[in-house]
Structures are given as structure tokens and as C-alpha cells.
């Protein structure tokens, strides 16, 4: 895979470019450059470690939005088996920005719901760039209520720039659909594990984000408004987005310190897009353990703990 490098990764890109040049020379001649390539690879790894150890909140926002970052569909295909997608909200239509269905996690049946941005131009348009409309959240609600009836744990994968704010979305009740999901998820009689895999923005993320355990991938973000939106409101310019990201505390580390996030799942060096299979394996391991722990708890005790968890926010 040809990596797209972010602005702060340019020194890494230059080193990787030199490695490619040496490999081309070595492949087209009898000169053995393996030692030189190995040295440069080691140097590139150390440089990546140094750069990623000093990321600002704004840098992490960029990583969370990386165009090659794995999406919900990438994790669903790797983490779950026998996945059968279910469609439609039974009211209006089928929103492609929400993927949901029944699958197996370590052989046990679960309900999986994820927000999907789409990779190609065609997919992005079809998925509405990961911005669900009311029918998307109502589809998610239908699947969660189905999971409750069949006693299936619910696993959500959060990755959205926000709920779609268009006129058609407002006409069909986007605020009501989000509010209804929040209310139902808070009392759903089955374990719920939520994971922010990329962008977790505003009510669009919260609509599938209420549960018993909240994970964030190391370089994902979670916020009530985008840093650009915050900067535009406070400073009247998007140029202040880096300062807004820092002030808002959008990273997994800050949110875990505040007690909002339960667990940060480490990513491969350089972000999840550098090694999707490794990231999927780590996510699977954590989800298996978390679902097993929650499933052992009596449902009434689980609901009480979920209620207390929600009531503790802001205290």
C-alpha cells in the first residue's frame, strides 16, 4: 500500500522515499544494498517513534481523519465472522452511512453497528461521507432492539464527522432520532460496548455511543464539535483549530483521564492504517474480553451501573 503522509510526517516520507530508491537500484543491478536499506528502515522506525511520541491534539485529529485509516467495514470483515448485514429502518429507507447486522465474535453471536465513511469517491457519496440521516439512526435502533429480544451483545464502531445537517435530514427528525437512540440505549437490556475507531463527532457519534464500556483507539478523537467549528465560533477563524483541539481535550488520553473513556486500545506505530490486520487483532482481543466480562454480570446490575455511569458525567 502506498501511504499518504501527513504534513508532520514529511521527514518520514523523505526517508521512505530514499528506501524505495535504494530498493529500485538493488533490484535493477547486482549491487547488494540490503544493509543500507535495513539501516534506513531502522532509522525510519526510530524517527516515527519520536514524531508520534510528541503529537499534538491537532496532529491526532489529522491521524483520525487519515484517508487510509481503516473504517468500520474493514474491522467488520476482520474481527467478525458470518456477518449478515441487515437493511432499512422500516419507516423511510436504508441509510448506507450506517452498517449493521448479525455476526460472530469468537464464535458467539453479536449485533454489530458501525458508521461508514466510504473509501472511493463513489462509496463516499453512497455513504454520505459517514454522516447518517435519521433513517440511519432508526435502523441502528431497530437492530439494537432486535439484539435485546435475542439477547445479543451490541458492539458499535463510531466514526463520523457528525449527523447529516441537511434540510431533508431535519425534515425527517434528525434530533428526535438521536434523542430516541440515547434514551433506548441507556436502558437496553443487553451488554453494549462502544468503540471510537476514527472521528467521534457530536450527536452523530453519541447516537450509537451510549453503553457499558467505551473504547477509543489510540489516535481516534471524540468531541462535541469539530475543532474547526469551535474555532470559528470562539475566534471567528478556522486558523485557530489547533488551539481549539488542545483546549477541547479531544484525545483518548485526556478523555480517559477525565473518566469519560474506559480504555485506550494501542495502535500500530504510525497509526492503524500502517497495519490494519494488527489493529483488527488488538480490537478483537479487547472486544472478546469485554463482552465476556459484561455478559457475566446480571442484567439489572448492568443497567444500574450504566445509569450511574451516565449520571457521573460532569460531576
From Swiss-Prot:
Its EC number is 2.1.3.15. GO terms for cellular component: acetyl-CoA carboxylase complex. Acetyl-CoA carboxylase is a heterohexamer composed of biotin carboxyl carrier protein (AccB), biotin carboxylase (AccC) and two subunits each of ACCase subunit alpha (AccA) and ACCase subunit beta (AccD). Residues 32-293 form the CoA carboxyltransferase C-terminal domain. One of its GO terms (molecular function) is ATP binding. Keywords: ATP-binding, Cytoplasm, Fatty acid biosynthesis, Fatty acid metabolism, Lipid biosynthesis, Lipid metabolism, Nucleotide-binding, Transferase. One of its GO terms (biological process) is malonyl-CoA biosynthetic process. Its main location: cytoplasm. InterPro entries: Acetyl_CoA_COase_a_su, ClpP/crotonase-like_dom_sf, COA_CT_C. The gene is accA. Belongs to the AccA family. Pathway: Lipid metabolism; malonyl-CoA biosynthesis; malonyl-CoA from acetyl-CoA: step 1/1. Component of the acetyl coenzyme A carboxylase (ACC) complex. First, biotin carboxylase catalyzes the carboxylation of biotin on its carrier protein (BCCP) and then the CO(2) group is transferred by the carboxyltransferase to acetyl-CoA to form malonyl-CoA. Gene3D superfamilies: 2-enoyl-CoA Hydratase, Chain A, domain 1 (3.90.226.10). It holds the Pfam family ACCA. It is an enzyme of class 2 (transferase). The keyword ATP-binding applies. NCBIfam families: accA, AccA_sub, PRK05724.1. This is Acetyl-coenzyme A carboxylase carboxyl transferase subunit alpha. It is found in: Cytoplasm. It comes from the Bacteria. The keyword Transferase applies. It comes from Cellvibrio japonicus (strain Ueda107). It catalyses: N(6)-carboxybiotinyl-L-lysyl-[protein] + acetyl-CoA = N(6)-biotinyl-L-lysyl-[protein] + malonyl-CoA. The lineage of its organism: Bacteria, Pseudomonadati, Pseudomonadota, Gammaproteobacteria, Cellvibrionales. PANTHER family: ACETYL-COENZYME A CARBOXYLASE CARBOXYL TRANSFERASE SUBUNIT ALPHA, ACETYL-COENZYME A CARBOXYLASE CARBOXYL TRANSFERASE SUBUNIT ALPHA, CHLOROPLASTIC.
Amino acid at each position: 500500500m502506498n501511504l499518504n503522509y501527513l504534513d508532520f510526517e514529511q521527514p518520514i516520507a523523505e526517508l521512505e522515499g530514499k528506501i524505495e530508491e535504494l530498493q529500485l537500484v538493488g533490484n535493477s543491478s547486482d549491487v547488494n544494498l540490503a544493509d543500507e536499506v535495513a539501516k534506513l528502515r531502522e532509522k525510519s522506525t526510530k524517527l516515527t517513534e519520536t514524531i508520534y511520541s510528541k503529537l499534538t491534539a491537532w496532529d491526532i485529529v489529522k491521524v483520525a481523519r487519515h484517508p487510509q485509516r481503516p473504517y468500520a467495514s474493514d474491522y467488520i470483515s476482520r474481527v467478525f465472522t458470518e456477518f449478515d448485514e441487515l437493511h432499512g429502518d422500516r419507516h423511510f429507507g436504508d441509510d448506507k452511512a450506517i452498517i449493521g447486522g448479525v455476526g460472530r465474535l469468537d464464535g458467539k453471536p453479536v449485533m454489530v453497528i458501525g458508521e461508514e465513511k466510504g473509501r472511493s469517491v463513489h462509496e463516499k457519496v453512497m455513504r454520505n461521507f459517514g454522516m447518517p440521516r435519521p433513517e440511519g439512526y432508526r435502523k441502528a435502533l431497530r437492530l439494537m432492539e432486535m439484539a435485546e429480544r435475542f439477547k445479543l451483545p451490541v458492539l458499535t464502531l463510531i466514526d463520523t464527522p457528525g449527523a447529516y445537517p441537511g434540510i431533508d435530514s431535519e425534515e425527517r427528525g434528525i434530533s428526535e432520532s438521536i434523542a430516541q437512540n440515547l434514551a433506548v440505549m441507556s436502558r437496553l437490556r443487553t451488554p453494549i460496548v462502544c468503540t471510537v475507531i476514527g472521528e467521534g463527532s457530536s450527536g452523530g457519534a453519541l447516537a450509537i455511543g451510549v453503553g457499558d464500556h467505551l473504547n477509543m483507539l489510540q489516535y481516534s478523537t471524540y468531541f462535541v464539535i469539530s475543532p474547526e467549528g469551535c474555532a470559528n465560533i470562539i475566534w471567528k477563524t478556522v486558523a485557530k483549530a489547533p488551539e481549539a483541539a488542545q483546549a477541547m481535550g479531544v484525545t483518548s488520553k485526556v478523555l480517559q483521564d477525565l473518566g469519560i473513556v474506559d480504555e485506550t486500545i494501542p495502535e500500530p506505530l504510525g497509526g492503524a492504517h500502517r497495519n490494519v490486520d494488527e489493529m483488527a487483532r488488538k480490537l478483537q482481543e479487547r472486544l472478546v474480553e469485554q463482552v465476556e466480562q459484561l455478559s457475566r454480570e446480571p442484567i439489572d446490575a448492568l443497567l444500574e451501573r450504566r445509569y450511574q455511569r451516565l449520571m457521573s458525567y460532569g460531576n
